[in-house]
């Protein structure tokens, strides 16, 4: 990309240069034309002007003999010239100067350049060439002969050719010729590309000019003079700045570079020496706190480093941040990154530093000495130089607590883990031992401490190497005098560390070196902060032996080493070896045998047992290894212990047996093994649950089957609710655990026994309810359990304390599937009654379980006709309860719809339906064939019964179905009589409008329905009366009953004012007497108020009464006693009783007419008593 950009820029510059040349040509032509125009300003024809003709003549004289008075030698040629032309161009060729001259010698100049100048002199034409040398020569020649215009044009031509590489040369030329335009242009390019200029670009400049240029272009001329390697310019600077020395020598430029450092980095010894001689500070530091010596070493500069050391630079100066001395920087050079020559130079620098008094024990910001760094960088040359230094302290530790030896022993590592291999390059693989030339061996030979315990943790180098998994280093240390029983902060020995990290070879070596295998840790090891490679539950345990460690961290090869060591130690003559003790326990009371089991090292566990480890040791909580294996759900370990004769009868502190634990933790193989070894399978737990129940309650049928197979009792009587005795089957059913119940049934448990009272009679209702498991299952709706019980011979007809069979219970709890299962049983007896006398069918009807009832009828067809203690069959009860579903069901199963209740009433279902007021049942009974005219014991039809109640719809239904509406009961009443008697207006309307019932019929008391109305009328009597007149306008209202009472008289005697008024409005006779001579006028009442109001409301003259006696005084009419009528009330009166006369305006009787005394009072006083 960078090259493409450069190419584009060069192309762009080329275009700009071409464009610039074009513009110059155009400018020259324009200037020429401008001159011509000015010369002939006032002439119309420019071609004929003197000036133009003169210029044309001069141009034509170029290289012509005509008028020539001068020769010019150009190279080997002599060119004809003209003095006046030359004099016109330059003062140096004035006529006075050329008066005696015959020839001008220009042979010293470039002929081509000279000819170009002469052509321009005559023709004012100049052809530019992109040749900077040619233009420069032409410009010098023009300057020589004071051809100012030509020089300016050459300047402009040269400016188009100026670039970064030649700008210095053109600048020098411009200064020589005093070409200010070109010089300024070059100065601008130099200023913009100052930092891009190379020392070669300044080589041709004189010291004075270069110094002048540098001063004008940069703030730091000394630094620039050194960069261009011009000692003469440096000298000029020192002379000029003598009064400000040495301060000026120690200034840093914009890049932070010191003048001395620039000189040294360029190996300018003469300049560097000059600077130092003028008091330049050799220990000056840059902005980063690095001295010149640091920087020289950093860039691998032997010349600069040795120069500074010789000139007294501080050899122990440390950098500002990392606190690294020059010796540190030298030590950091690695042969993996640098060539042998560079490494050799570094060794020379190190030697020079040490000879100059460098301190080899100084530590950087990380606490590392040059020795540390030389080991990390594997800088053998510097390492050797440091070892030869007598002041070297081998035991200094860095901030990580590492000595030089610790870093050296990691040289052999093959791990790629950065915590193990801190070196940046690939680890070196050179076997498993350190030769005598290794850093580590040389350090130990020099006297380095092989233990060097860490201050914080107390880990010695051997433990650190083992902890890092560097077994080769650890073996090297172990065989080089490291202490085998050193204990760190937590009481851990190197043997512990080796076992924890699985270093079998190191373990064997340490045991050979006398390491004690019975030492126990004092504290739990801390959990590593970083993501640990090795994590175990053992991280929080202490009091561990090395063997605990090996087992806990699952290193069987290490365990084998220790076991072999024990076997060998028993026969060894080496007193250094100590025999391991397998009975030691860690902080969790775990022996090595227990840990071997939990880590799955059963082969090792067997070897431990063979070596005398106890299999039945109990922990502080009373648990054996068998208990713990079961609780861990470690079947393999549990079986291992059982195979090696672990005690199965030992209980935990909570009283749990191994069998109970195995069931609780769902270990079928362990349960089988324990049962095989004769465990007691009837021992209950602390809650009284036997092992079989524990298994079934957890849905562990495989374990339960194992227990049963080994002879476990499936019935198992035990304590139940309220202290009664129950079997496991009772309990399973009571808890709705069908899978458990079915398992117990299939396992041969007792399926028929009910719960029993406790040994001392304990137990409440449950102990005496007599319910078998089948009763309980039917009650809870456990279909699978019921089916299983029936399959395995449960008594389907067993009765509980209430006499109920299972089918009774199933029906009462509405469990349809169970009902079908029970009814389908071949041995079912459906005639069994409970204490309430209910058969299963009766129970089904009681609970409206039609499906059950239908199923029972299929088995026993006569079940529906059974009657209760009141003589009612199921249809009767259903009708009385208005249970339409049951009625429809019974109708559907062909129940007798005309059967009568077996009691004194002898009512049919239709009678009961009417009494219940259920229209839909009435309709369905009629549809099913109920006889509509069946009579009760009082000879009443269903219509009679409906008429007495407010059941107009049922009346209509009965009428539609052909009921005998004329039928009368034992009192001679038809349905209309009874409807009127009970004031059933709607029923009366139905009877009067929907049939032709005789509304004038008399009952045995000689009363028609209207007489009944007058005698029994209620609040709606007037409405009933109006209905009669509406339906029968010609009804004989004055017709008396058997005792001579009219409707009005009966109503008046009953005080039914509304009915009386309705009757009076209909125009009846008012004064009719009954057989006892009583009428409304003489009937004894508390007040005549009603009578007066009835008379007052007469709007027309009523019909006259007839008779043989006066209605008022009862005098018999004869010849002397004539008949008269009261013209107001129509009564038959004698003369004495009708003496008063008065006009009756409301009857349109304007003349006085006869009225009775009562009517006179009414007419005069109004309807007021």
Swiss-Prot record:
**Source species, domain of life:** Eukaryota
Can you say where the ANK repeats lie in this chain?
217-247, 255-284, 288-317, 322-362, 366-396, 490-519, 542-572, 588-617, 621-650, 654-683, 687-716, 724-753, 769-798, 802-832, 836-865, 870-899, 905-934, 938-967, 971-1001, 1005-1037, 1043-1072
From the UniProt entry, list the residue stretches annotated as the region Interaction with RHOD and RAB5A.
Answer: 650-759
Q: GO molecular function terms here?
A: phosphatidylinositol phosphate binding; small GTPase binding; zinc ion binding
Cite a single GO BP annotation: endocytosis
Query: Zn-finger regions (FYVE-type) at which positions?
Result: 1104-1164
What InterPro entries does its record include? ANFY1_BTB_POZ, ANFY1_FYVE, ANKFY1_BACK, Ankyrin_rpt, Ankyrin_rpt-contain_sf, BTB/POZ_dom, SKP1/BTB/POZ_sf, Znf_FYVE
Position of motif NPF?
Answer: 421-423
**Got a GO cellular component term for this one?**
macropinosome
PANTHER family the UniProt entry points to: ANKYRIN REPEAT AND PROTEIN KINASE DOMAIN-CONTAINING PROTEIN, RABANKYRIN-5-LIKE
Protein name, entry field: Rabankyrin-5
Annotated organism of origin:
Mus musculus (Mouse)
The organism's lineage? Eukaryota, Metazoa, Chordata, Craniata, Vertebrata
């Amino acid at each position: 990309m960078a090259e493409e950009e450069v190419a584009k820029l060069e192309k762009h510059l080329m275009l700009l240069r071409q464009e610039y040349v074009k513009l110059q040509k155009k400018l020259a032509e324009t200037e020429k034309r401008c001159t011509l125009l000015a010369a002939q300003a006032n002439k119309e024809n420019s071609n004929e002007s003197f000036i133009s003709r003169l210029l044309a003549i001069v141009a034509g004289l170029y290289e012509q003999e005509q008028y020539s008075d001068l020769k010019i030698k150009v190279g080997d040629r002599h060119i004809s010239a003209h003095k006046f032309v030359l004099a016109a161009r330059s003062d140096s060729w004035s006529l006075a100067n050329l008066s005696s001259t015959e020839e001008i010698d220009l042979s010293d100049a470039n002929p081509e350049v000279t000819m170009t100048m002469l052509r321009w002199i005559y023709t004012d034409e100049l052809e530019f060439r992109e040749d900077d040398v040619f233009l420069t020569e032409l410009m010098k020649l023009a300057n020589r002969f004071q051809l100012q215009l030509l020089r300016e044009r050459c300047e402009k031509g040269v400016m188009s050719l100026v670039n970064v590489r030649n700008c210095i040369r053109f600048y020098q030329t411009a200064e020589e010729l005093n070409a200010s335009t070109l010089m300024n242009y070059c100065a601008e390019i130099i200023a913009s590309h100052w930092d891009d200029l190379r020392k070669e670009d300044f080589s041709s400049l004189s010291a004075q000019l270069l110094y002048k240029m540098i001063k004008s272009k940069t703030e730091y001329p000394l630094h620039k003079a050194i960069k261009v390697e011009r000692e003469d310019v440096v000298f000029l600077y020192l002379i000029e700045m003598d009064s400000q020395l040495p301060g000026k020598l120690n200034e840093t430029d914009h890049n932070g570079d010191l003048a001395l450092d620039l000189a040294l980095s360029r190996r300018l010894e003469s300049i560097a020496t000059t600077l130092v001689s003028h008091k330049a500070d050799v220990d000056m530091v840059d902005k980063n706190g690095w001295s010149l010596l640091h920087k020289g070493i950093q860039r691998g500069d032997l010349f600069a480093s040795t120069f500074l050391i010789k000139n007294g630079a501080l050899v122990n100066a440390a950098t500002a941040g990392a606190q690294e001395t020059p010796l540190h920087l030298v030590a950091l050079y690695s042969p993996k990154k640098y060539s042998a020559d560079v490494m050799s130079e570094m060794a020379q620098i190190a030697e020079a530093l040490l000879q100059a008094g460098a301190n080899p024990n100084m530590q950087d910001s990380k606490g590392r000495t040059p020795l540390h760094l030389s080991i990390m960088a594997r800088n053998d040359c510097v390492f050797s130089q440091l070892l030869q230094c007598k002041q070297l302290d081998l035991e200094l530790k860095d901030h990580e607590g590492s000595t030089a030896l610790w870093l050296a022993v990691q040289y052999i590592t093959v791990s790629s883990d950065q915590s193990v291999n801190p070196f940046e390059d690939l680890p070196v693989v050179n076997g498993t031992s350190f030769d005598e030339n290794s850093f580590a061996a040389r350090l130990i030979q020099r006297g380095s401490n092989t233990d060097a315990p860490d201050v914080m943790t107390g880990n010695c180098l051997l433990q650190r190497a083992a902890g890092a998994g560097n077994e080769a280093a650890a073996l090297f240390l172990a065989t080089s005098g490291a202490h085998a029983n050193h204990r760190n902060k937590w009481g851990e020995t190197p043997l512990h560390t080796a076992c924890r990290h699985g270093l079998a070879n190191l373990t064997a070596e340490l045991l050979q070196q006398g390491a004690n295998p019975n030492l126990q840790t004092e504290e739990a090891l801390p959990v590593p902060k970083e993501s640990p490679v090795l994590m175990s539950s053992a991280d929080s345990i202490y009091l561990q032996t090395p063997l605990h460690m090996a087992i806990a961290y699952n290193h069987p090869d290490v365990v084998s080493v220790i076991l072999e060591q024990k076997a060998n130690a028993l026969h060894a003559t080496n007193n250094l070896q100590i025999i391991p003790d397998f009975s030691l326990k860690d902080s969790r009371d775990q022996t090595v045998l227990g840990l071997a089991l939990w880590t799955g090292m059963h082969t090792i566990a067997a070897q431990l047992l063979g070596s005398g480890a106890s299999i039945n040791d109990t922990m502080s909580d009373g648990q054996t290894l068998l208990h713990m294996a079961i609780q861990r759900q470690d079947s393999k370990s549990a079986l291992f212990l059982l195979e090696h004769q672990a005690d199965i009868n030992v209980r935990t502190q909570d009283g749990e047996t191994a069998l109970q634990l195995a069931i609780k933790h769902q270990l079928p193989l362990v349960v089988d093994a324990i049962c095989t070894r004769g465990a007691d399978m009837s021992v209950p737990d602390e809650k009284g649950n036997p092992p079989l129940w524990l298994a079934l309650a957890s849905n562990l049928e495989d374990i339960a089957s194992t227990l049963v197979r080994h002879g476990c009792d499936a019935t198992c009587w035990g304590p139940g609710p309220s202290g009664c005795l129950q079997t496991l089957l009772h309990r399973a059913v009571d808890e709705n655990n069908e899978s458990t119940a079915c398992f117990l049934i299939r396992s041969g448990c007792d399926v028929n026994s009910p719960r029993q009272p406790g040994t001392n009679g304990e137990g409440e209702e449950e102990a005496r309810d007599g319910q078998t498991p089948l009763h309980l299952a039917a009650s809870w709706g456990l279909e699978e359990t019921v089916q299983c019980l029936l399959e395995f011979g449960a008594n389907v007809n067993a009765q509980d304390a209430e006499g109920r069979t299972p089918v009774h219970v199933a029906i009462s709890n509405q469990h349809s599937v169970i009902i079908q299962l029970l009814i389908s049983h071949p041995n079912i007896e459906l005639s069994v009654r409970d204490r309430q006398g209910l058969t299963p069918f009766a129970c089904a009807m009681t609970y409206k379980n039609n499906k059950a009832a239908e199923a029972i009828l299929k088995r026993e067809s006569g079940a529906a006709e059974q009657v209760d203690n009141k003589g009612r069959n199921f249809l009767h009860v259903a009708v009385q309860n208005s249970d339409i579903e049951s009625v429809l069901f019974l109708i559907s199963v062909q129940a007798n719809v005309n059967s009568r209740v077996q009691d004194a009433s002898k009512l049919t279902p239709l009678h009961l339906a009417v009494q219940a007021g259920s229209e839909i049942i009435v309709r369905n009974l009629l549809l099913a064939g109920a006889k509509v005219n069946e009579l009760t014991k009082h000879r009443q039809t269903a219509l009679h019964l409906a008429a007495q109640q407010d059941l107009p719809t049922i009346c209509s239904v009965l009428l539609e179905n052909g009921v005998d509406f004329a039928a009368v009961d034992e009192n001679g009443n038809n349905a209309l009589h009874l409807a009127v008697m009970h004031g059933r207006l709607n029923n009366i309307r139905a009877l009067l409008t929907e049939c032709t019932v005789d509304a004038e019929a008399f009952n045995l008391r000689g009363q028609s329905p209207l007489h009944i109305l007058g005698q029994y009328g209620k609040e709606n009597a007037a409405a009933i009366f109006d209905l009669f007149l509406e339906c029968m306008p010609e009804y004989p209202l004055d017709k008396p009953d058997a005792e001579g009472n009219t409707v009005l008289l009966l109503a008046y005697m009953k005080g039914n004012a509304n009915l009386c008024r309705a009757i009076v409005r209909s125009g009846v006779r008012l004064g009719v007497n009954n057989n006892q001579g009583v009428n409304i006028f003489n009937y004894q009442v508390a007040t005549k108020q009603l009578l007066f109001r009835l008379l007052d409301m007469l709007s027309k003259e009523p019909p006259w009464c007839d008779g043989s006696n006066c209605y008022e005084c009862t005098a018999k009419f004869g010849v002397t006693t004539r008949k008269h009528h009261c013209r107001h009330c129509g009564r038959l009166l004698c003369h004495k009783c009708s003496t008063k006369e008065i006009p009756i305006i409301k009857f349109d009787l304007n003349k006085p007419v006869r009225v009775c005394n009562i009517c006179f009072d009414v007419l005069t006083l109004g309807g007021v008593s």
